[in-house]
Amino acid sequence: MKAWIVLMLALSLPVAAVAEEAKEGEAPKVNYITLSPPFVGNYGLDGTPKLKVYKADVALRVTGDEATKAVKANEPLIRNQLVALFAQQTTETMNNVEAKEKLRQEALKQTQQVMTDETGKPVVEDLLFNNLIIQ
């Protein structure tokens, strides 16, 4: 009976080792986290009578489940930072493609700073504007 148990254990060890190697060989999963609801607010608060409004649909790219959990746990801080950034913009920084790319890069930088402050790692690899409407 003992021999049978030892034999079964011996046969199951290689299977467990192969399964562990498969887990180690897997590439971490890339996740896109959409910050919902979309950002809507005013920008260009320079004293002109015309109200300027933006709507931004933002997604964050992270790798791995731990990074996804960290971003979701800190989403209110990220949203606060992005709302403040969008509100600081002027008509010039929202009106052309190059300026929008600079805004995207600054939003990514600030998001990474929030995550570094909270978790010790930037975690967010990229920030994407799925939609950016200005009026």
Predicted features and spans:
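Flexible, low-complexity charged segments
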Residues: 1-135
